[in-house]
Design a protein with these regions (language model features):
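Donor-nucleotide binding loops and adjacent catalytic segments primarily
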Residues: 422, 440-539, 590
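A nucleotide-sugar donor-handling region in carbohydrate enzymes
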Residues: 373-377, 381-477, 507-509
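Conserved nucleotide-sugar phosphate-binding/catalytic loop shared by glycosyltransferases and other
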Residues: 260, 264-315
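Conserved alpha/beta-hydrolase catalytic His-Asp/Glu region
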Residues: 88-150, 155
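Catalytic active-site module of serine/aspartate enzymes centered on a nucleophile-bearing elbow/loop
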Residues: 187-227
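Active-site loop/oxyanion-hole signature of alpha/beta-hydrolase fold enzymes
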Residues: 1-41, 210
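Flexible "cap/lid" loop of the alpha/beta hydrolase fold
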Residues: 51, 59-96, 561
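Short beta-strand/loop motif that positions the catalytic acidic residue
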Residues: 159, 165-167
Length: 630
């Protein structure tokens, strides 16, 4: 068991009571011994707990608030209880300022906790948590008696268990000298992190996780080893689980890659709903996939009625991405691969650039969009945040160009939006041309195979006299509101189009049984080869995901697409690309009443279209680029 010792709800108390509480918890949970981890002032509680030698197996102290290591210079220039003429910098660490401007103090304090560039997310989180209490309550916590230096040193010298001290050298809250002193006084191991601030477990979590693991439970050496020349040629493929579009194109790329390297074995690190596509294609899903935290569930939890703030949802997925990177780390540590392929595998790309020493194989990055873009109603703050994320990515690539051995854009340069990454940042199209190879779009099929519409309709079960409308929202569970809106429109559309047959495809994460029944309307779940049904339809109503829209564009079918509100990729990147092809008709969900949808279906069904042709060799081109690394 690992017990984390940290600050509790504020009250007038000594650290001893916190340590006693921890012992009581161990007793209640029948935990004989524990490894304790203390952060900042929680280290003082940890020292008290470590005095119970029979209960503490080992202790880890991160950025310790350890009085035995001297004072923190920048924090002793002002007295906490004095009224001051002005409150700038550390003068804000003051009772009167806390009572006057609690938010102002939090914003300053956490800007000092997270001194690392591009720390907007943890600062935002911590300020939000801090606002759950008040300046008055915070001031009360400061009245508790402080641990004195000699008392702290005495406790440290009594510690008999193994100790690891982790401290950022740039810590602006607790000087690194305190961590150095604590390691010396406990006889513990000291790890100093250059450039890290007060919370390295937040800003350098991979490094801290690995330090914890090596200290607590070092990995045993592998029992078997194979000489390089006797190893099978292997690739690890990570496909984005947000929707199903990535999975379909990735299977097509994998098929082409095997044609170029017939001896190549491909393992997939994947989660639902991607696993449904992989299972249908008889691909090998690595058993480690069972340990992945599900990203689609998070995305669904972030959505409202046809509304998904995609940028913020991914920002708030940070703990999931970290957990999944650690799964990947353990997998590639134990099993050698000749190649890693990540199709919008954000966890892999971000944490590799943050920890380039963890790269163990050539790595290919695939994406169909470049650049986070702000939604108009997000104002200046959202524009600042997206620019900050873009700047971090640009800096990653500039500092560590060797991390991505290939960066492949799934499309052409004209598909890239003309916007800039942000103020004083380059144009997205210009930067992408310099840093990516272009493979063309990957459909996973040849549109020429569907030239005989009559035969195709017969194969998928549609009769010649029917006017077939397919309604689908991809592989996530976010699109349920659009499906229900279209189902509401069906009776009126059917009245206007007597031959109408509507097929609502819910995908693997929406229950088909939750929809109303009508004659001429059928509701189906996951369809493995949905693109064939789309190619055979007379009209499709879809959400706005790139894959489905491009499948319809490639097969020249008329379609209505309804982008999710606040989904920057669907509203900007996908819409721009479809405009290049002259494809689809965009419909605003706010205006898409059942009557409006019925009217649009009546206008669009069976309409002849003249889209720009979509290339059919994208998968081959992509595989050829990847094969260069094998």
């Amino acid at each position: 068991m690992v017990a984390q010792i940290g600050p509790r709800k504020p009250r007038h108390t000594r650290s001893a009571s916190n340590a006693a509480d921890a012992v009581a918890i161990m007793d209640a949970t029948h935990t004989e011994r524990a490894i304790i981890i203390g952060f900042s002032r929680g280290v003082q509680r940890g020292l008290l707990l470590a005095a119970h030698q029979e209960r503490v197996q080992a202790a880890v102290f991160i950025a310790p608030s350890y009085p035995g290591g001297g004072k923190v210079p920048q924090r002793i220039a002002f007295e906490w209880g004095d009224e001051l003429d002005s409150y700038e910098g550390w003068a804000k660490y003051n009772k009167h300022y806390w009572l006057r401007d609690h938010r102002g103090f939090l914003e300053f304090f956490f800007s000092q906790v997270f001194i690392e560039p591009h720390s907007t997310k943890p600062i935002e989180d911590c300020v939000g948590w801090g606002l759950e209490t008040t300046g008055e309550t915070l001031a009360l916590t400061h009245l508790a008696p402080e641990m004195q230096p000699e008392e702290a040193r005495e406790m440290a010298r009594r510690v008999r268990c193994p100790v690891l001290v982790i401290h950022g050298e740039a810590d602006a809250i607790q000087s690194a000298s305190r961590g150095i002193a604590l390691a010396e006084h406990t006889g513990g191991q000291l790890i100093l992190l250059d450039g890290s601030g007060h919370a390295p477990h937040v800003r350098d979590p991979v490094r801290v996780n690995l330090l914890l693991r090596d200290f607590i439970k070092p990995a045993p050496p592998p029992r078997r080893w194979a000489r390089g020349r006797s190893r099978r040629k292997r690739a690890l493929y990570i496909s984005s689980p947000i929707g199903l579009g990535h999975a379909r194109r990735d299977v097509a790329i994998a098929d082409e890659l095997r044609k170029l390297h017939p001896d190549l074995e491909i393992d997939w690190l994947a989660q639902h709903p991607v696993t449904r596509v992989l299972q249908a294609a008889s691909e090998r899903i690595h058993p480690a996939s069972a340990y992945l935290a599900n990203e689609s569930s998070h995305i669904e939890s972030e959505s409202a009625e046809h509304d998904l703030h995609c940028f913020q949802a991914i920002r708030r997925m940070d703990e999931i991405l970290l957990a999944n990177f650690m799964v990947l780390h353990d997998l590639v540590r134990d099993e050698p691969y000749d190649l890693w392929i990540g199709d919008e595998a954000w966890e892999l790309d971000y944490y590799l650039h943050e920890n380039p020493e963890q790269k163990r194989a050539p790595y290919v990055w695939l994406t169909d969009f470049v650049g986070w873009l702000p939604m108009p109603d997000g104002g200046d703050h959202e524009a600042f945040l997206t620019a900050d994320y873009n700047a971090e990515m640009i800096e990653h690539i500039a500092r560590f160009p060797r991390v991505r051995d290939h960066a492949i854009f799934v499309g052409n340069d004209s598909d890239i939006v003309p916007d800039a990454f942000g103020p004083e940042l380059p144009l997205i199209r210009d930067w992408t041309r310099e840093h990516y190879s272009f493979a063309g779009y990957v459909t996973g099929f040849d549109p020429a195979d569907f030239a005989d519409q009559g035969r195709l309709r017969h194969e998928v079960g549609y009769r010649d006299h029917e006017q077939v409308c397919i309604v689908t929202v991809g592989g996530s569970g976010v699109g349920g509101h659009l499906l229900r809106r279209v189902v509401e429109a069906f009776p009126e559309a059917k009245r206007r189009i007597p031959a109408l047959r509507m097929v609502v495809v819910t995908g693997p994460r929406i229950d088909p049984g939750t929809f109303a029944e009508h004659e001429g309307l059928e509701v189906r779940g996951f369809i493995p080869e949905l693109y064939r049904h789309l190619a055979a339809c007379d009209l499709a109503v879809v959400q706005g995901g790139l894959t489905t829209c491009m499948e319809l564009t490639a097969t020249r079918r008329p379609f209505l697409y309804v982008p999710l509100r606040h989904h920057f990729e669907q509203n900007f990147h996908v819409r721009h690309r479809l405009d290049q092809y002259g494809a689809g008709r965009m419909l605003d969900f706010d205006l898409a009443t059942p009557d409006a949808i019925a009217n649009m279906i009546t206008q669009e069904i069976g309409r002849s279209v003249d889209y720009k042709a979509v290339e059919s060799d994208g998968a081959t081109n992509t595989a050829t680029l990847i094969a260069e690394l094998l």
